[in-house]
């Protein structure tokens, strides 16, 4: 854990963190009965402290490569626009969940060969019992007015074969709220 950021953050500087995750992915992706049998594996990587951007980028690239060695298609949350740095992260052929334009430059990612799934928080996040996202999706508005190419503030991105579609996300940001 990275105590100054909360117990829910991995310490991206500790060798033990990498050893643990390597062992976990090895167990889940190999052997006679792997847990992850589908083609894709999501590595997470999102919403870390900006002061740690370079190490975050290193961690992200490390696990994109790690998952690829098992023949899996790695997925990740799009955070690299916000987590600026010099450490290269190769998104070519990787799938990013494009959840917020402030966190991911989607057009650039698509031009560089990333695949993307629109998971735009403004339209597609359900976070019950909070006042900053929806409790439910607006099905009628989505059916009548929305497009998978639509991001924040209704901005439409260019059509791309690497835009795979869209998905919604349900989060429980309030632990202990009975939901």
Where are these regions (language model features)?
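Short secondary-structure boundary/capping segments
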Residues: 1, 58-60, 131-135
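Active-site neighborhood of glycoside hydrolase catalytic domains
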Residues: 3-95, 99-114
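Flexible, acidic glycine-rich loops studded with aromatic residues
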Residues: 87-94, 100-179
């Amino acid at each position: 854990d990275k105590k100054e950021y909360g117990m829910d953050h991995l310490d991206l500087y500790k060798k033990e963190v990498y050893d643990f995750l390597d062992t976990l992915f090895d167990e889940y992706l190999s052997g006679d009965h792997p847990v992850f049998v589908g083609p894709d594996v999501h590595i997470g990587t999102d919403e870390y402290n900006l002061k740690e951007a370079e190490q975050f980028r290193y961690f992200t690239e490390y696990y994109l490569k790690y998952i690829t060695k098992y023949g899996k298609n790695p997925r990740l949350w799009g955070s690299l626009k916000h987590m600026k740095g010099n450490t290269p992260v190769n998104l070519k052929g990787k799938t990013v969940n494009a959840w917020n334009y402030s966190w991911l430059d989607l057009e650039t990612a698509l031009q560089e060969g990333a695949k993307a799934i629109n998971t735009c928080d403004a339209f597609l996040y359900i976070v019950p019992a909070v006042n900053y996202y929806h409790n439910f999706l607006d099905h009628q508005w989505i059916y009548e007015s929305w497009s998978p190419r639509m991001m924040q503030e209704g901005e439409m991105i260019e059509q791309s074969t690497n835009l795979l579609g869209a998905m919604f996300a349900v989060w429980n940001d309030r632990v202990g709220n009975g939901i």
